Amino acid sequence: QDWGGQSGGFLRMGITARSIAMGGGFTAELDQSFATFHNPAWAAFLIHRQLGSSYTNLTMDRRLAATSFATSLPPTAGVGVAWVFAGVNDIQGRYSTGMKSSKMQTGENALMITFAQRIVPWISIGANFKLLRYDLPITESDQISGSGIGFDIGLLIKAGTYSTLGIMVQDLSSNYQWNTNEIYTQGGPYKDEFPTI
């Protein structure tokens, strides 16, 4: 699918080496330390608290970082919170004359709050509520920020000791909303929609 160039790509990259190596197919598999990232319904089946942190240096001065915490909420629920950040630093700014100005950086942030509930002992549903923000430098003194909200919904069915079925819909209504009135004379509101997968 051609989702790479669309908004919110940092949420589709994968967080842990194991999940990336397995192609991101973790909807029905528990990703240790990042239990609710691939399917929020996992929070209702947790036995132990899950805490994880990840940092990755990527090419072209990009970086990806994440922190996650999830725990069961007895008797049949689970909660979690996670933060994912992606950004680029050391962007060389330029004046309109072409001369170098100061270095700038850009960054995308997602704060995810998770709740999951077991309906019966072997089925759970869960949701991630996302607060989204993108900070983008325009010039040395001007910066524009886009923000929005989004949701993930997941279902998990424990079909047996070694069999699990998972379904997840990622980035329902997720978007960045921008307003460029203060930066450009003909600016205005604009919305970048995330692809729903």
Model-flagged regions — what are they?
Residues Q1-G23, T27-E29, H48-Q50, T56, ...:
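Outer-membrane beta-barrel porins/channels
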